[in-house]
């Protein structure tokens, strides 16, 4: 029995020695391969070149910031932003010296290498979503970034890149936003939803001129008597060819139910007004539902928004 125990002890000791010294037993080239595998993966293609160019410009390694929701879930946005026919790149990142997310614009030089042109600091430490919009009546494209702060406050920034300069043309707090052509013009509009101190929901419609300045086209409020906040917003076309806005608002005694409001843009008054195809009260009654995740959306991709109703 004692010999068996001693044999086991010797075997365990030898095994520990082998495990502890396994690294020293590896040839130098194999050790290098192991170390390479343990490193963080490097991006390839344009993404890798953009990351390298940004790090070289910063003099340190940037931490890429990924949007947490939306259609664009990459920290890299490749698009012709200034309308010159050449592809530009926007990169979302932070560094050890910045508290908020930063936006860098890069372009290719004559040799085809990416170079940082400018960087601006954003509005918060988290990127909620990113989208591209054509808010101006030009060939340029704007970058729309939604930020979320630590207190769960939401801030929207619209960036324009023109003549080699990155400008922030809008900074505003919001709860929901939508980029759509509501007014029927040649460019898209920006619709912002927010809840006021009295509990009412404010709908703000903004359009941009050729110089990039936003003007307030319409402001509407949803009564605090019925709604306590904005859950979602969607836009689509109607059978009459007009553009409609569907707002889902929190309602009910508990504030956990949803009901919908249908609005359209009236060119004469230049306001968002209730649609006449169905009365506001009737739509409220038929769309009142107790499923908070059942929001209005274009389910079949035909450009028409479907509004859920509560079954009898």
Give residue spans per PLM region:
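N-terminal secretory signal peptides that target proteins for export/translocation
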Residues: 1-5
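Sec-dependent N-terminal signal peptides of Gram-positive bacterial secreted proteins and lipoproteins
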Residues: 6-26
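Beta-propeller-forming repeat regions
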Residues: 22-312
